[in-house]
Amino acid sequence: MKNDSITLEIIQSSLQAAADEMFAAMRKTAMSSIIYEVLDMGTGITDAQGRIASSGAGIPAFIGVLDKAVQVLLTKYSADGAIQPGDVFITNDPYYGGVTHLNDLVLAMPVFVDGKLIAWSANIAHNSDVGGMAPGSLSGEATELFQEGLRLPGVKLISGGQPNQDIMDIITTNSRMPDVLLGDLWAGIASVRIGARRLEELAVKYSVDTFISAMNAFMETGDQVTRAALKTLPHGTFELSEEQDDGRFFNVKVTISDEEFLVDLRDNPDQDAAPTNTSRDGTIVCAQMLFKSLTSPDTPANDGSFRALTVLTREGSIFHAQEPAAIGFYFETEVRVYDLIWRC
């Protein structure tokens, strides 16, 4: 096993290159302009446990979704043999690993070498229509998630390399733009397959043990860099309460010490009857982006970068909605999370 600094740096750069190639493949083959022109997507790589292993490519908030989605899949498919080489999983449900809203389809593929699960390649992209009460699957009148489109709670889209046609048919039949959606699905599948192939090649070249050791080393470095930066930030407890356009107040309390960056969002309004809620995972993603920008904005992001971050939310609040709360315009609320912590 090689664990010298040069080999580790090569593997780190190769992980980023794989994510970049996944991004390019999806952009070139997608059929929706929101993917190939707007670039409303993200790609990334996790280790076998679903911990983010590279900064990925695309929208930072999207990349922060991928590890959470994979971890939900690992929990759901925990039985021996439930995850096999060639499988591709799909989720879009914010209450089952999808994190954002139903338009954003997450695809994840396990990476095996010699029968051992060593990593995951994953992507997420906004799809133009996944059903629901309004064209485009987004409506300000939605009061529950069921009105916003088809829910996919982490299912196998590809099993052992073969398409699960029943799932494909269910997805496309529920869309007003089935041909475009199907094309985007295959673009996403091609993307994760390319990523998986590159990771397999990397692990074979340097050995599985070196590959896994390198990812663990990156995460430890990320943790060390973050904790060193924490010591340079102002310490203490900082609070902010800000009135919103509808008269409600959003509140945040941030406590910074040498060992922890604690964000407390528990004292906030109950979830809405409107589609402006966000999932707890979505709230965490926003806190992670802010935390990274404060501690180590110039270094690659991975699981270790966020070990010193703790986020407290209250279940049933707008920042930790319970199903089936509507969540279509989650991003408006998530941006407020970022702003609140930053201004605090």
Question: What annotation goes with each model-predicted range?
Answer:
Residues 26-38, 83-84, 179-182, 200-216, ...:
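Flexible, glycine/charged-enriched surface loops at secondary-structure junctions
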Residues 193, 197-270:
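Accessory "access/gating" subregions that flank catalytic or transport cores
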Residues 61, 65, 97-98, 171, ...:
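Hydrophobic core positions in small helical hairpin nucleic-acid-binding modules
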Residues 59-73, 106-109, 121-158, 268-290:
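Extended active-site and interfacial segments that coordinate phosphate-rich ligands
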Residues 14-38, 74, 78-79, 93-98:
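Short, basic/aromatic recognition patches
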Residues 112-199:
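Mobile "lid/hinge" segments at catalytic clefts and subdomain interfaces of large enzymes
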Residues 37-40, 103-106:
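Short, small/polar residue-rich loop motifs at catalytic or cofactor-binding pockets
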Residues 104-114, 122, 254-256:
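A short, hydrophobic, proline-anchored segment that marks a local hinge/packing element in signaling
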